[in-house]
């Protein structure tokens, strides 16, 4: 069964995740395929992006699709007053799939409800970033050969980081041993997210208390652009720095992930450690997104 939309990490079943991992393995070293020949992908980025936009663009091209779209809201008719619904309807006329990033929570879900073609959420406000969660879990799977039974820790901005919401929700499809949530009190995971989780969760403010238990340390930057109050941002912007002292206390085979971009939350000297996997993680974005495109468009009969 092909995927219809990928708006939330909960749109994927456990089997979907493993099928995407298997496809990503096959696509990793591929130069060019024609699976999506004759298809058009719209990249509708109403909010700025570098890595996500470029990796989706590359993934589509490597599968043989043509790519159209825009990189900011200012370059669209929305700047002239057009509403989002009309923009989505117009893109339906030009393409077979829309990859969408937007500053408002729930924008991708709204688009999926009016679109006749698949919507892939490339990040909507502080809500979700489901394809990043697939990349995150694929990296864990490649490192350990499994996801079940592993101990995770998410560190940093757990309130505004949409990658955190998607990863926590994605983990409900697996059986982690436990998940530590490490953040300042002002940046804790929102209660409505915690209420959805079906695995053991422990909240703390001190990474040193739990670092020796962790298999996967997932670090996020403080989301400056989500803060309404600049003063509040200044209070927490350097709450945590993953440095060599902390890393040296990790398990030898423990891994450090980061969805990027990194600011100051990981000391650059950590980059050379065996635990640092965030650049490898980034290298998996294209094959994972190729797999996702294949799942929503490959071998799909036109309506």
From Swiss-Prot:
Binding site for carbamoyl phosphate: 51-52, 101, 129, 132, 260-261
Kinase in keyword set: no
Gene Ontology biological process terms in this record: 'de novo' pyrimidine nucleobase biosynthetic process; 'de novo' UMP biosynthetic process; glutamine metabolic process
Top-rank lineage group of the source organism: Archaea
Enzyme class: transferase
Pathway assigned to this chain's UniProt record: Pyrimidine metabolism; UMP biosynthesis via de novo pathway; (S)-dihydroorotate from bicarbonate: step 2/3
Ion transport in keyword set: no
GO CC aspect terms: cytoplasm
Reactions accelerated catalytically: carbamoyl phosphate + L-aspartate = N-carbamoyl-L-aspartate + phosphate + H(+)
Binding site for L-aspartate: 80, 162, 221
Assembly, per entry: Heterooligomer of catalytic and regulatory chains.
The protein's role, per its UniProt record: Catalyzes the condensation of carbamoyl phosphate and aspartate to form carbamoyl aspartate and inorganic phosphate, the committed step in the de novo pyrimidine nucleotide biosynthesis pathway.
The protein's name: Aspartate carbamoyltransferase catalytic subunit
